Design a protein with these regions (language model features):
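Long amphipathic alpha-helical scaffold regions
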Residues: 148-177, 231-258, 312-319
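Transmembrane beta-strands of outer-membrane beta-barrel proteins
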Residues: 13, 136-138, 173-175, 214-217, ...
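Transmembrane beta-strands of outer-membrane beta-barrel pores
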Residues: 16, 63, 108-110, 142, ...
Length: 319
């Protein structure tokens, strides 16, 4: 329904669609170019008046294929030049969409990709306007992994319709309940399946020239690795200034050696590594430009080390 210049769709259901999109070469036009041309304004300086509202869009058993024919195939690796999606299912609501403001609610999106990627569920609420962009209720589920974020927000000012980068401020929180590397094999083909899954929680704030990771908590599911700390990073005219407080790194030489072997079996570690036993470190590291300072306390089963190290340009100082 088109009313008062707005395209309003109360409900739409699409079942069993099969889309085939391609480019003959990387530089040639795609086979859907005529659609893009029909939607684009002839006057490049004219503001789009498109207004769209979809109360409910349901997709079931869809498939999409995209190829650039002169690009090589990689059957077990995810390849943006050869994408093949199957079993696409989605429920999407778009209360409003205009050039100046948008609200999109993805209740569910799932699909399988030929490289092995299996997206079980993606859901989120996304909005933007001339003052802010927000991502709420983000949930991503793979067969053995789950990532969540209650809120990611970006505020800014606009000048002549464009975001003024120097006014940007952002904040957010990420909760990776579990990330299993077997789910990412299509992106990281060399990594083996039996690397211990990891969990991560982090909160952060920042602006145009700085970021403050207020809390960072990384640990393996088997507790073989625990990393807790916070980081501040700022950029000025002379380069980057950074400070990292490491509240705790806890692991063992055995766990580290096993993980390195799973990542790259060709790396051979010295036999004495296992005798180090448990590892515990706490400390601080900071720097600016070419200066680095490390201060900390390293404890192991074979002894303790008080670490005081600094580097300025090409000179290294050990206390």
């Amino acid at each position: 329904l088109i009313k008062n210049g707005c395209i309003y769709i109360s409900s739409a259901q699409i079942f069993g669609f099969d889309g085939n999109f391609y480019k003959k070469t990387n530089t040639s036009k795609p086979n859907y170019q005529f659609v893009l041309d029909s939607l684009s304004s002839k006057d490049k300086n004219k503001k789009s008046n498109l207004k769209l509202s979809i109360n409910s869009l349901i997709i079931r058993h869809g498939a999409i294929r995209y190829d650039i024919y002169d690009a090589p195939y990689t059957s077990s690796h995810f390849n943006l030049k050869h994408i093949k999606l199957n079993d696409i299912s989605a429920h999407i609501i778009i209360p409003y969409y205009t050039q100046d403001s948008t609200y999109i609610s993805v209740k569910k999106l799932s699909f399988k990709e030929s490289s092995g990627l299996d997206l079980r569920k993606l859901s989120f609420d996304f909005s933007f306007n001339k003052k802010c962009t927000k991502l709420h209720n983000f949930n991503l589920s793979l067969p053995n992994s789950k990532i969540e974020s209650e809120s990611l927000s970006l505020v800014y000012k606009t000048i002549n319709g464009k975001i003024d980068n120097k006014t940007i401020a952002y904040s957010g929180a990420i909760n990776i309940n579990r990330i299993n590397f077997s789910d990412l094999k299509c992106f990281l083909p060399r990594i083996k399946h039996n690397i211990t899954p990891l969990s991560l929680k982090a909160t952060f704030t920042g602006a145009y020239n700085n970021i403050n990771i207020e809390s960072f908590n990384l640990h393996s599911i088997d507790k073989g690795l625990v990393f807790i700390g916070n980081v501040k990073l700022k950029k000025d005219k002379n380069g980057f200034i950074w400070n990292a407080n490491i509240r705790k790194i806890e692991s063992s030489a055995e766990w580290i050696a096993h993980t390195i072997k799973e990542i790259n079996p060709s790396i051979k570690l010295p036999d004495f590594i296992n005798s180090i036993g448990k590892i515990y470190y706490t400390g601080n590291t900071n720097g600016h430009d070419k200066y680095i300072s490390i201060n900390g306390n390293l404890k192991t089963d074979i002894g303790n080390i008080l670490v005081k190290l600094s580097k300025n340009v090409n000179d290294i100082y050990v206390n």
